[in-house]
Amino acid sequence: MTKQPHLGLLTCIAAFAAIVTIPPDVAHAQDSLKIFISVDMEGIGGIGTGRMTSSSGKDYALGRELMTAEVNTVVAAVFEHGPADVLVNDSHGDMQNLLHTQLDPRVQYIQGNLKPLGMVQGLDDSFDAAIFIGYHARAGT
């Protein structure tokens, strides 16, 4: 996988912000945090054209690598904070974009678009934090 060190800083800041806003009593009352991550593609660092986000695009393979690398950067930041249970939900297009064989093995992964709750499938009130990666503004705005 291509290393993208310039992507890591902003992604880590976002993940850290999500983690540090967890109330201390919650963070210390349990052995590990439960973190939900939903990842879209158009807002991923390095994604610049539709050719990188469409499965028929000539640069889609690179887009998938960038998406997977950004998720792994966030996951690494979560685990630097301490033990965690992390659920990652692929939320772009047909929801089968992340390179699951390259995802951090400590995560659980949901893929495929047959999910009743789509982009938030798996999220419930048992999670301590939700992190949304790669999301974008509405088309045409």
What residues fall within each predicted segment?
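N-terminal secretory signal peptides that target proteins for export/translocation
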Residues: 1-6
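Bacterial N-terminal signal peptides
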Residues: 8-24
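Boundary at the C-terminal end of the N-terminal hydrophobic targeting segment
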Residues: 27-30
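N-terminal glycine-rich anion-binding loops that anchor highly charged ligand groups
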Residues: 36-48, 52, 63, 67
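Short beta-strand segments
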Residues: 38-39, 89-90, 130-135
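Alpha/propeptide regions of enzymes that mature by internal proteolysis
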Residues: 58-90, 94-98, 106-108
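A glycine-rich helix N-cap at a beta->alpha junction
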Residues: 105-124
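Internal, conserved structured core segments that host functional sites
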Residues: 120-141
